[in-house]
Amino acid sequence: FVYDTAGHIVTNNHVISGARGAEVVFANGDRLATRLVGADADSDLAVLQVEALPEGVEPLPLAEPDSLQVGEFVVAIGNPFGEQGSMSVGIVSGLGRSLRSQRSQGPSLGYSLPGVIQTDAPINPGNSGGPLLNLDGQVVGINSAIASVTGVNSGVGFSIPVIAVHRIVPDLIEQGRHIYSYMGLSFASELSLSDQTTFGLSQSQGAYILSLASGSPADLAGLRAADPNTGRGGDLVIAVDGQPVRNFDELNSYLVFYSAPGQTIEMTVLRNGEELTVSLTLGERP
């Protein structure tokens, strides 16, 4: 979709990855060449640019972050199966989902994008990179993926949240890439009551540290990971900068959308039942 009057166009990274070139077709039939401005595999976002927008073409307005609610009607626009300019309607089925990084090698295997929107609006091959709109015509997400065993819509589609557009796209335009914060930790995704007992924790809410990289910001800050043999003894993160953390996804959302490399954050942890505050200076994601 058209992002601004300078001719920047937002799409999915996986749509343009590996392509020698890309062109865009506007609703009036104008077909224009583009140049790649920036791309980010971890969020599956990319920005293209045309030299000048056709007359009458205007950018789509972005919704405010966190304005979407479960049950709200949304409209998906794209080119499913090559059918240009198709629109489909559905509801927001869920919020706070996550998508794995599009990068296939290296340490990025453990990275994921938080805050992803789940919708039952039909999303099929060709919808990728198109906007997900609210009924006010504002962009609330970028259609990215479907959960299906057949490769076509099964009522479970996923869209990158608009907060990622607010946070990441300006960096892609200015410097061609987005630099994420990095702690050097791996966590249990969510803790069940059984996990609480297994790990010897006093509560099940929080992000439990399973391992940390030697020499990482987390290691230098003095955080503790679980014993690899017993699974016990790791720190349980319960708040960051005063914001409660109920699970890893909430911690990941804070890091991805509200922090920057070089920033020092205050992490509240439970260690052997005792509440501690640990200062950690964030690094850059490899």
Task: Please name every model-derived segment.
Residues 128-129, 192-198, 212-236:
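PDZ/PDZ-like domain micro-motif
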